[in-house]
Amino acid sequence: MRSRCSWYPAHTMIAAVPPEVLSETERSLQTFGRVVLCQIVRAEGSTPGKVGWKLLARPDGSFVGNLGGGAFEALVKADALEKIRLGAGVDASEIKRYYLTEEATRGEPTGMVCGGMAEVFLEVMIAAPVLAICGGGPVGQALARAAAMAGFEVLVADDRPEFRNPELFPAGTHLTVVNRDYEEDFLSPLRHRDLYVAVVSRCWETDTAALAAILRQLRQAPESSLRYLGLMGSRRKIARVKDELAARGVDLSILGDVQLHAPIGLPIGGDSPGEIAISILAEVIGKRYEKSAVKS
């Protein structure tokens, strides 16, 4: 049976965007970190949908909105999900042309005989990267301010009441209360986002607890998009933390291709909280864009 086609000429008024598509786009970005918004931007001849119709594709295979249904919409959905599967960046956004004939796009017969053509803008949308900071002391505060200016969404986890004050951090910072052992699942709401983690807590015991908690949460959520993990401290302190993790049976190999940057930051000199924060953020940004600086 051939797919049904509605006739919408090219000059048809742009259709209103369903409000659920707009509201779900922001919500889905926060939940999944990456979506593809598909919009018909041009139509010629008979097409299933109007110019302006939108469809939101999400990593779990679900969709919001529609482009008119049928084999045409199925092809667009498949293309959108493929971009998500490949982890495409915003530069992979494109306008793609679909011919609504029996010998359709990519040579796949659709059963459609509309004879029209539709161009669809497949817009890859990625949520702001997240920098999770374990430790809300002077370095953590300076790092939060710098990261917010660089476009990161910031989360700060600390067990000390005096460092849970929103006035110490930039607006919009997620302040998470943890105990000294970091037993709370503080990364769970962000595990689908591009995630960067800096451990800059007050002592080797809390550093160890934070790292153990991060590795535990990664083991429980293998789909996590961890891009960077760094630990502040001297080489002696770092060695002690690693020894303690080994004694607890915590295996760093769960990080896979993610390197533990320890000591954290680029060796640019300076030891004030602000200077340390800049060195950390420089390393994080370098990792984000796959750029490296030579370390001594």
Show the residue positions of the predicted features.
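Adenosine-phosphate binding glycine-rich loop
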Residues: 232-296
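Short glycine-rich anion-binding loops that position phosphate/pyrophosphate groups of nucleotides
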Residues: 43, 202-205, 234-237
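ADP-ribose/adenylate-binding Rossmann-like module
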Residues: 196, 212-244
